[in-house]
Amino acid sequence: MDKIVLICATGRSGSTTLQRIINIIPNSNICGENFGAVNSLLEFYRRIKTTTFEYVPGHLRPASYEDIISKNVKPSWYNSYNFQQTVSMIKMLIASLFKNSETTNVWGFKEIRYDNGNINYIKEFKELFPETKVIIQVRANIQAQSQSNWFKKDKNALQYLNTLNNEFYNFYNQNKEWCYFTTFEKMFDKANVKKIFEFIECQEHYDENKIKQILDNNIKD
């Protein structure tokens, strides 16, 4: 079975470096950001699920248009899609974005667009792919983070990051069995990185030398 790994992070928290570290695993393909596109697919899944189970006459076996009309029911929620088939297509689309070959057996992506409660989309991802493991990465020193790149243009950056870190930590606390919480600062802690590899069940591929090379080579934007 494939191993699916998501890196859910705040901006300027070292998520790209963590992505590079995970990608030392043979046959892995942890992609970069997708501008929250996967969130949109998960929103679609969330909405089609609500439509199916709360509104569509017949739910998983939608009533025909003729049957609805014959019972003098307003067809405002009439639908003809197959829910299970629709879910399968969503899963196939998501997998096709990141599983780039038949031999790829560790795949996923990293994303930073999880503010305003969007971290909760990961629950839908977990429903679709129960084998998913999530690494949540923030930066402990939000003072320095708030002065990095685009954040330094936002006078409310410090408050924003503090709120976001709390949201991420609360999400982790609610889902500890499949989430690992870490920080930018802990990427330089060998024991912590080793635990991450153990968490995603790839401990045999932990390579201290390769990881050091990545940490020593900070690719600039």
Language-model segments: residues:
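Catalytic alpha-helical scaffold of carbohydrate-active enzymes acting on polysaccharides/glycoconjugates
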Residues: 85-95, 165-170
